Amino acid sequence: IFSGALSDHLGRRKGLLLLGYGLAALTKPLFPLAHSVEAVFVARFVDRIGKGIRGAPRDALVADVAPPAIRGACFGLRQSMDTIGAFLGPLLAILLMLWLDDLQSVLWVAVLPALLVVLLLLRLKEPTRPTETRPFRSPIEWRAWRRFSRSYWWVVAVGGLFTLARFSEAFLILRAQQLGLASQWVPLVMVVMSLCYTLSAYPAGWLSDHLRRSHVLAMGLLLLIAADLLLAVASSIPLMLCGAALWGVHMGFSQGVLATLIADSSPSELKGTAFGLFNLVGGICMLLASVVSGALWQGWGAAFTFYAGAGFALLALLLLSRRPRQASWQQSQSGCD
């Protein structure tokens, strides 16, 4: 929350983005230099802090610069690029390991992309907001929450319930192993999921600019329900991989659209705070979802876990249908939702 609110208070996002991505760049050399588990833990911890700092200001900056008519496509593109990086990074690491056969050398190579990001940010020119439009004198102002409409809190609630239905992708790997997928082929599950996510995120964002965003999000929920049901009944690896593919497509139809809805339903001077609150709720719900899913897996098995996920997705779909009357997330050019 704090980094997003601070970016609203300062009227600029770039400094916090540099801090967040800079921390990530600083931690990268620590991994090849680490000689203990404690050192790796510290490096990873600082890296996660950097991710937390940059998350809300980054999404708020996208909302600041994206033209309203193509805001969904812009967030979809951001999701696609983020997933491409998460997909190509491990793939490149595997290829380098096969070529160099030296883990430390591969870890040093990872320093380069992190530094390039910082250099690109240094050249970034962001729009400035006049001081008089900044909402409060202090970045920590609970009064700011009163500025958020029912529409915004409704999107946060839908997103939280959605996240409860979308537990960690680690359960997809567990399901594949349960069905007999050999350990050397386990990464294939994440490859299929990430590839489908990457390919669907931008088209889904574009679609949300031309249809009601809530309808596109409903498609994402229906895809999640279908993925859960398929993963619950799958008795073979091909069926399981089809479920993973549907899971990836549902991510493409939901994550960017949810971010766009947050941008649509929050005041322009509180975008950072809005994304910070949304990310906080999402993080808490993801933790709860993984804990509950782990307990269900241990107590009732894999199928019941995925059925429960489908149930939560159905609840989110019902909440989605109960949108506040004043909610209008479609651009002025294309009407209201």
Positions of the model-derived regions?
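Cytoplasmic helix-loop-helix junction between adjacent transmembrane helices
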Residues: 43-84
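Juxtamembrane intracellular "pre-TM" segments in multi-pass secondary transporters
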Residues: 126-158
